[in-house]
Structure formats: structure tokens, C-alpha cells
From Swiss-Prot:
Subcellular location, principal: cytoplasm
InterPro entries named in the record: Phstyr_phstse_ac, PTPA_C_lid, PTPA_sf
Record organism: Yarrowia lipolytica (strain CLIB 122 / E 150) (Yeast)
Upper taxonomic lineage: Eukaryota, Fungi, Dikarya, Ascomycota, Saccharomycotina
Top-rank lineage group of the source organism: Eukaryota
Gene name, Swiss-Prot/TrEMBL: RRD2
Function: PPIases accelerate the folding of proteins. It catalyzes the cis-trans isomerization of proline imidic peptide bonds in oligopeptides. Acts as a regulatory subunit for PP2A-like phosphatases modulating their activity or substrate specificity, probably by inducing a conformational change in the catalytic subunit, a direct target of the PPIase. Can reactivate inactive phosphatase PP2A-phosphatase methylesterase complexes (PP2Ai) in presence of ATP and Mg(2+) by dissociating the inactive form from the complex.
Record-level GO cellular component terms: cytoplasm; nucleus; protein phosphatase type 2A complex
Descriptive protein name: Serine/threonine-protein phosphatase 2A activator 2
Catalytic activity: [protein]-peptidylproline (omega=180) = [protein]-peptidylproline (omega=0)
Length: 354
């Protein structure tokens, strides 16, 4: 078998259409829905039987955090955009991934190559120094591949409540250290500068809660009390802590609107549909989606692009993918504490999603 890396194959609207009707898309989306299902009504502290691979995955993510400490930004105030040391961190991540992941089980060389490719791509783009829902999707693909290989049991909540929670913690450390730019620059019009899935999984966790309601995200005491137990509450608390304006209505109007939904179950249903429509069906995101032997390209999509050619990205709007550089909320918050407040530089006129 070939030991080539997974490659991009969705290069045109026609490719996207083929992918949308494919078994591969159904399998990946189905995997996300299974993960969502198994955390309904369960907080982060929920006790569940954990396969040994769960602890190994957490240990790997801890090693990623250790790498952040080894490659600190030399100048924390030189720019409000991404820190170039991220490239050194990412190179070290790629160099170490094989040794880390080979410990997960008996893997053939090609399987290890594919797992490492999705894993490394889960932490942002080394060239653009950015991160978005497409990179988060790569982590889901990494877990999906482990499931395909029979190494990960998803019929429990541990894949989300232990592994994904640790991944989110790891990404927050990476984002805070290197000020990764939001991929797509959705800014205030999206759910979050970086992530989507914590809101989906988090709303599933709260679907059966006795007294917490969607409107509870406006109660600072509730957020502080439950930020470690529920992903959704933790994300709102985090957003409030880094945004440079005080009101959720101002800095995150979509989240504010969603808080008006009557039940968390309805919120979760909407999040699942939104993930399908705004992540798994958008060309600016899926043009970076990679296919190999574990995640097979649908028949009829474009052949892989020339690896020596410059990557051409398709943009539906001016801020898609890698269009306009916009600082992260973390960067804006940090810089607003410095002389020459930069908070007014943050854009607020971007249309929602792609």
C-alpha cells in the first residue's frame, strides 16, 4: 500500500456537490452525531469506563501543551496578528507526532502516516498562522480514523468528555500563546473565533438539565459555577473573558440570539443542522478537507492538486478562509491592555459564516 499523505480533493463546487451526496460525508457526519448523542445529559465530570487509549490520547495532548512552553513567542507585543514562533511549534509537533501516535496501537506505516496527517492539521495552519472549524474538523477526522481502525470505542462519552475536552484545553493554550488568527475572520458574527463543536456538544450536555436554560448564559454567577462542567458554559465564559466589549449582544450577537431558544434540546438540534450546513457543506472549509485510505474520496471528485503548485483557495466572501487578516479576540484583548488601545480595529461587518 502507498504511504502517501491524505490529500485535498474538493477543489470545485462540483466536487463539493459530489461529496455532499457521498457515503464518506454520511460517515463523517454520522460520527459527529454519535459523539453528540453519547454526551446528552452528561457533564464533563461524568464517570464512564475508559479504554486505555483514552488516557494515551490525553497524554499526547499534554505533550502538545509542553511543546507550547518550549517555543514561546519572543516578543509578546510586537504584533496583534499571529506569532511566527507558531511555525516552529508546528514543525516540532509534526516531527514528534509519529512517535506519540505509534504508541496508540499496532499500526501499519500507511495508517500511521494518515493518523499523523490529520492530527498535525488539527492545530492550525503553519503557513497562515490561523485556526478555524476546518482544523477542528481534522481532529474529528483523527478520532474517526482511530474508530475505523478499531482503536477507539465511541459507544461511550469519553471521546468527548475526556479527549475532546482536553483537545479544547490544548487549543486554548496554543491560541493564547501564538495569537492564532481566526480562519475565515468571522469575528463577532460567528459562534466563536475558532470553534464550533464545543457549542454542539455543550448544548447536548445541557439538553436534560433541570434548571439551566439557554438564557442562563447571561448570568455571570451561573457561568462561573458551571464553566468547568459544561462545554457551552465554559465557552461563553471564555468568550466573555477575551472580548473587548462587555455585552454578549455586542460581541457575539449570534450566541445572544440563540439564548432566546426555549430549550437546550432545540439548541442542540439547531447546532447539528448548522454544523452540516456551515462546516460540512461549505467550499471555503472543505477545500482543505483531506482524503486517504481511511477517509476515502468519493468517486468523481477532482484528482489531487500538484503538490508543487501554489495552493489556490476559493472564497465566497471577502473574509473567507485566508482573505483578510483579522486579529483574534485573544490578541485584541491583550493589546487593549497596552498603550494605544487597538480594540476599535476589530471588524464587525462580516456576514455570518461563509
Amino acid at each position: 500500500m502507498s504511504h502517501s499523505h491524505p490529500v485535498r480533493r474538493i477543489l470545485s463546487p462540483k466536487d463539493l456537490e459530489i461529496f455532499g451526496a457521498s457515503d464518506t460525508k454520511k460517515q463523517v457526519f454520522g460520527f459527529v452525531k454519535v459523539l453528540n448523542y453519547y454526551v446528552v445529559g452528561k457533564g464533563n465530570s461524568y464517570e464512564t469506563l475508559k479504554h486505555p487509549i483514552i488516557g494515551k490520547l490525553v497524554a499526547i495532548l499534554d505533550k502538545v501543551i509542553d511543546l507550547v512552553a518550549k517555543y514561546p513567542p519572543e516578543d509578546a507585543t510586537s504584533s496583534r496578528f499571529g506569532k511566527p514562533e507558531f511555525r516552529d511549534f508546528h514543525q516540532a509537533l509534526e516531527e514528534n507526532a509519529k512517535d506519540w501516535i505509534s504508541d496508540l496501537g499496532e499500526l501499519e506505516d500507511w495508517q500511521l502516516v494518515e493518523l499523523c496527517t490529520y492530527f498535525a492539521a488539527s492545530f492550525g495552519d503553519r503557513t497562515r498562522i490561523d485556526f478555524g472549524s476546518g482544523h477542528e474538523l481534522n481532529f474529528i477526522c483523527f478520532l474517526f480514523c482511530l474508530r475505523q481502525l478499531g482503536l477507539l470505542d465511541t459507544d461511550s462519552s469519553a471521546a468527548v468528555l475526556t479527549v475532546f475536552v482536553q483537545y479544547l484545553k490544548t487549543m486554548r493554550a496554543v491560541q493564547a500563546s501564538y495569537w492564532l488568527e481566526p480562519a475565515g475572520s468571522h469575528g463577532v458574527w460567528g459562534l466563536d473565533d475558532y470553534h464550533f463543536l464545543p457549542f454542539m456538544f455543550g448544548s447536548a450536555q445541557l439538553a436534560c438539565h433541570k434548571y439551566l436554560r439557554p438564557l442562563s448564559i447571561h448570568d455571570m454567577e451561573m457561568l462561573d459555577m458551571w464553566k468547568h462542567e459544561y462545554l457551552y458554559m465554559g465557552c461563553i465564559h471564555f468568550i466573555n473573558s477575551v472580548k473587548t466589549t462587555a455585552s454578549l449582544r455586542w460581541h457575539s450577537p449570534m450566541l445572544d440570539d440563540i439564548s432566546g431558544v426555549k430549550t437546550w434540546a432545540k439548541v442542540n438540534q439547531g447546532m447539528v443542522k448548522m454544523y452540516d450546513a456551515e462546516v460540512l457543506s461549505k467550499l471555503p472549509i472543505l477545500q482543505h478537507f483531506m482524503f486517504g485510505q481511511l477517509i476515502k474520496a468519493p468517486e468523481g471528485v477532482s484528482p489531487p492538486p500538484d503538490p508543487n503548485a501554489e495552493v489556490q483557495h476559493i472564497h465566497n466572501h471577502w473574509a473567507d478562509c485566508c482573505g483578510i487578516k483579522v486579529p483574534s479576540a485573544i490578541a485584541a484583548s491583550e493589546m487593549s491592555q497596552k498603550p494605544g488601545d487597538l480594540r476599535k480595529l476589530r471588524g464587525s461587518g462580516v456576514l455570518p459564516f461563509d
